[in-house]
């Protein structure tokens, strides 16, 4: 088995996530793997152990900061809105986004890393040019990027360091965030 330096949140806290999902009786927003209350419990921990299959599970606190901020993030995402975490370096923005993604979508690795060289095809989609030449524009020739994957699967897409990307890349996200539609004009 291959080990990584820092396994994704959904791997590190697999047992906690599984227990919370299986004991969660709250209403889940569309495409959420657990209710907003269970997401809050996963991130902020629980003073009381969770009983599951005859065992007690302690849900540890993972985010040590402003609890109200976590709650506002959860409410924003439950309202099907985009969420942008802005702050000084080292203030746990990435960690909080990973925790939210793992709890809500079951995956925290659907991520775009923003740089000055980020292009639209790195965030939306690109093409397998051999297939494109052989078969023309088709779903088979399309190579999905994180934003496409997120929209197709109904999972969160994390965008790290968005302010480092060119303005036109940031502008191209506005329509996707407001309309919740990613157009692929080549497919008609």
Model regions: which residues?
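AAA+ P-loop NTPase catalytic core and its hallmark functional loops
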Residues: 2-188
């Amino acid at each position: 088995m291959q080990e990584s330096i820092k396994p994704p949140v959904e791997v590190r806290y697999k047992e906690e996530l599984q227990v919370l999902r299986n004991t969660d009786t709250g209403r889940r927003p569309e495409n959420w793997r657990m209710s907003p209350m269970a997401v809050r419990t996963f991130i902020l921990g629980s003073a009381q152990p969770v009983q599951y299959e005859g065992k007690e599970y302690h849900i540890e606190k993972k985010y040590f900061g402003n609890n109200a901020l976590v709650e506002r993030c959860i409410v924003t995402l439950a309202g099907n809105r985009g969420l942008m975490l802005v702050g000084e370096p080292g203030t746990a923005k990435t960690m909080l986004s990973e925790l939210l993604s793992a709890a809500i979508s079951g995956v925290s690795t659907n991520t775009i890393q923003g740089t000055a060289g980020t292009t639209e095809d790195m965030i939306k989609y690109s093409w397998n040019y051999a297939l494109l030449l052989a078969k023309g524009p088709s779903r088979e020739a399309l190579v999905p990027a994180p934003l496409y994957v997120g929209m197709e699967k109904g999972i969160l897409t994390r965008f790290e360091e968005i302010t480092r990307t060119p303005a036109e890349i940031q502008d191209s996200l506005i329509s996707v965030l407001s309309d919740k539609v990613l157009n692929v004009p080549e497919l008609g």
